[in-house]
């Protein structure tokens, strides 16, 4: 790991090592600790392929075809996607597991990533049962506007936290389109007003966001809340600015309080004190005006240690709110590149740890949000490259045309 010392020259992303790290993740077995998370294989696949995309590493035609076949094999017959085939019985179709929101989100992103060229991009969602997926999402919404993760035994399960609202909002934007009742592609929508009301009820006394106003605020929940609202406001063409921000305005009652909460997540990294006293490491917060030098990390909650991923959760949230200048970017960039960038590629959670896929991907996302020249431009709302978002928009248009009988997908023209 790089030395945590200041330098006159700004630190740089070791791009080739990160490419090698992600290529290993793509082509070889993952380390044994990942075994327990095999049911979330779609998530790891999306991190891997999206990281390579951010690093401008193209997929081969064979890889693109393989990704597409595998993702579609995990589509559930009742709507949505399963995270992997782990929970299906021997000899049973992989898609007979349980669909969940996270897997469905990552499946759609992966299908977009696996397309190259206009024809492939327009056919990227061919094979996705759009109507079943959108209807399935409606079954996950409770009367209070919150969403669960999946349906088990006829009941919505998985808590009421903002992650589910975010994932539902993303899937809705990627698939629904600007379709009016009476159109062949019409599917009844989720209750958007109740979704916004649920997010609104999640803001806490300190300006942050939690599952409800009585729970502990968390920067990750803040990102999911703002992401959910932003996707509700986003035009079908993401290159256009929203004409209104009704969801964002209605869903955040205390905007200044949220800025204060997010700005307070940034604090000076104290390497020497970490060595002297493990109990006190990274707990001291500093005033924003004193953060011009050194390394500055982020935590997700009050009185917690710095963590690579919160450079993303905080920075991404402020970017969506149009207030990224609230934080001091250069020392945050130094923290990521000097402290948690690993010698074998990837990023660790904190100083001294090994790299892992979650923190390695969100570390890249944070740097892309800061405008790192070695990375593609990032769509902060979907946490993928803007190029991938454009592919998803073309995939949506192609799918809607196919539903209306105006265009055939891959299965119809024998592309694969």
Across the structure, where does each feature detected by a protein language model lie?
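Preference for long, amphipathic alpha-helical scaffolds in soluble/luminal domains
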Residues: 1-416
């Amino acid at each position: 790991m790089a030395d945590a010392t200041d330098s006159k020259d700004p630190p740089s992303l070791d791009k080739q090592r990160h490419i090698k790290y992600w290529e290993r993740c793509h082509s070889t077995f993952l380390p044994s600790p990942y075994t327990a998370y095999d049911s979330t294989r779609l998530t790891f696949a999306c991190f891997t392929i999206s990281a390579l995309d951010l690093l401008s590493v193209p997929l081969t035609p064979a890889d693109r075809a393989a990704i597409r076949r595998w993702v579609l094999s995990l589509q559930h017959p009742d709507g949505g996607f399963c995270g992997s085939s782990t929970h299906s019985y021997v000899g049973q179709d992989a898609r007979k597991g349980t669909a969940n929101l996270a897997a469905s989100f990552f499946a759609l992103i992966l299908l977009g990533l696996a397309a190259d060229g206009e024809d492939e991009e327009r056919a990227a969602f061919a094979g996705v049962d759009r109507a079943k997926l959108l209807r399935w999402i409606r079954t996950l919404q409770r009367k209070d506007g919150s969403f669960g993760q999946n349906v088990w035994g006829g009941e919505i399960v998985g808590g009421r936290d903002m992650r589910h609202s975010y994932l539902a909002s993303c899937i809705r934007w990627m698939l629904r389109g600007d379709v009016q009742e009476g159109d062949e592609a019409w599917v009844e929508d989720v209750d958007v007003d109740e979704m916004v009301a649920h997010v609104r009820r999640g803001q806490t006394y300190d300006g942050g966001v939690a599952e409800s106003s009585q729970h502990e605020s968390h920067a990750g929940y803040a990102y999911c809340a703002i992401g959910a609202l932003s996707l509700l406001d986003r035009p079908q063409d993401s290159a256009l600015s929203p004409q209104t921000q009704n969801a964002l305005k209605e869903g955040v009652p205390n905007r200044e309080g949220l800025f204060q909460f997010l700005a307070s997540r940034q604090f000076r990294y104290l390497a020497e004190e970490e060595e002297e006293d493990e109990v006190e490491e990274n707990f001291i917060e500093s005033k924003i005006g004193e953060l011009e030098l050194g390394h500055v990390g982020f935590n997700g909650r009050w009185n917690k240690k710095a963590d690579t991923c919160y450079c993303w959760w905080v920075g991404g949230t402020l970017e969506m709110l149009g207030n990224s200048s609230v934080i001091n970017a250069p020392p945050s960039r130094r923290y990521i590149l000097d402290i948690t960038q690993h010698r074998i590629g990837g990023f660790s959670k904190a100083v001294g740890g090994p790299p892992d896929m979650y923190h390695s991907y969100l570390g890249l996302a944070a740097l892309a949000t800061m405008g790192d020249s070695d990375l593609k431009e990032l769509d902060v709302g979907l946490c993928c490259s803007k190029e991938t978002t454009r592919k998803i928009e073309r995939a949506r248009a192609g799918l809607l045309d196919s539903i209306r009988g105006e265009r055939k997908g891959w299965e119809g023209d024998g592309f694969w």
